[in-house]
């Protein structure tokens, strides 16, 4: 009986540790490919700060890059992670990018398993580059490498 209990405990531990935490190989390969990022012209609505990331809420007329479920949503939520968050946060806090402003974003629009990976890799307005695509993508890749899944 003790062996069965121990075996069940070990199996439970393995499943717990191999859960959905971190970025697996499929996720890392997809999100590091620059061809999987789409340019979106949007109107900035608002943002929220959450732990180590930002959520940007935008409106866009052209939702072809997004999942069909987004077509009925008035706003789309995009996520800013890692160093990209550190780079962009002050522009939102200082209202350099404010409600109603036109902004061009380059972001992933990938849904994998049960998660939305709408990650912002570039942000610019007509006259200002807030985050370059090269830096933004490099920061996303670094963030994923620092947060790999066990399997």
Regions found by a protein language model. Give the residues of each.
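Positively charged n-region of N-terminal signal peptides that target proteins for export
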Residues: 1-4
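C-terminal motif of bacterial Sec signal peptides marking the signal peptidase cleavage site
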Residues: 16-19
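Bacterial signal peptide processing site
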Residues: 21-23
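Structural detector for short beta-strands of small beta-barrel domains
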Residues: 34-62
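Short, cysteine-centered beta-strand-loop-beta hairpins and adjacent loop/turn segments enriched
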Residues: 64-72, 112-114
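Beta-strand/loop nucleic-acid-binding surfaces
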Residues: 68-95
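Flexible glycine-rich surface loops and low-complexity tracts that mediate binding to linear polymers
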Residues: 96-121
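C-terminal partner/receptor-binding element of secreted or periplasmic proteins
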Residues: 118-151
